[in-house]
Swiss-Prot record:
This is Chromophore lyase CpcS/CpeS. HAMAP family: Chrphore_lyase_CpxS. Keywords: Lyase. Covalently attaches a chromophore to Cys residue(s) of phycobiliproteins. Its EC number is 4.-.-.-. It is an enzyme of class 4 (lyase). The gene is cpcS. It comes from Synechococcus sp. (strain WH8020).
Length: 200
């Protein structure tokens, strides 16, 4: 693990630093009559640049010129117990539209919102030390999410949702970067080479 002396403070860098597979351990507190929840899942993040066809497609939904966007990322939520193909029912495309005068601030255009399954517009802002705040107003609720890197292998994420009827929900997540298949194979080959060159 490496401490991040210069955490990402633009969405482009944040997406790139988040690239890959993450194990999410989350706890959800329902501040009404429902029981709390705890679960694990996987999250796959794949950033893309402004030339990706998704940029124009999603920007058109919001009436925003694609030239204002700076790429984005695809997200997939998966079970961490079953080997599954990626399911678009548990996926989202997020487009980054930074403010030209303030690259640490901007808008996120989502083809599908996290809370309400419809296109969603969010605002975002980074603090100088890399804490990302995302605010999203839906038709029937308002969400705030904060996310930051503890180091290059661990992310923290907290969020809250306030509904019109007053009921609220809070979520706390610790996210661990998972090694890729190539990483595992490389480590295995290194161990094999070490064992061959350093016999007992």
């Amino acid at each position: 693990m490496t401490v991040m002396d210069n955490p990402p403070v633009t969405m482009e860098d944040f997406f790139e630093t988040s690239r890959g597979l993450w194990l999410i351990r989350r706890v959800v507190h329902h501040l009404d009559s429902q029981d709390d929840e705890a679960a694990d899942s996987n999250l796959v993040i794949e950033p893309f640049n402004a030339s990706d066809e998704a940029v124009e497609k999603v920007c058109k939904v919001f009436g925003i010129e694609a030239s204002e966007a700076n790429g984005g990322a695809r997200f997939w939520w998966e079970s961490n117990l079953l080997a599954e193909k990626r399911n678009d029912d548990y996926a989202a495309i997020v487009i980054d539209v930074p403010k030209p005068e303030h690259p640490d601030q901007g808008y996120l255009l989502r083809d599908v919102g996290y809370v309400e399954k419809k296109p969603a517009l969010s605002t975002y802002e980074f603090t100088p030390d890399g804490v990302l705040t995302i605010k999203t107003r839906y038709d029937t609720n308002f969400g705030i999410e904060r996310c930051w890197f503890v180091n290059d292998q661990i992310r923290m994420r907290v969020s809250s949702v306030q509904f019109l009827n007053g009921a609220a929900m809070t979520t706390y997540c610790t996210e661990f970067r998972c090694p890729s298949k190539a990483d595992i194979e490389q480590i295995a080959n290194q161990a094999k080479t070490f064992a061959q060159t350093n016999p007992l």
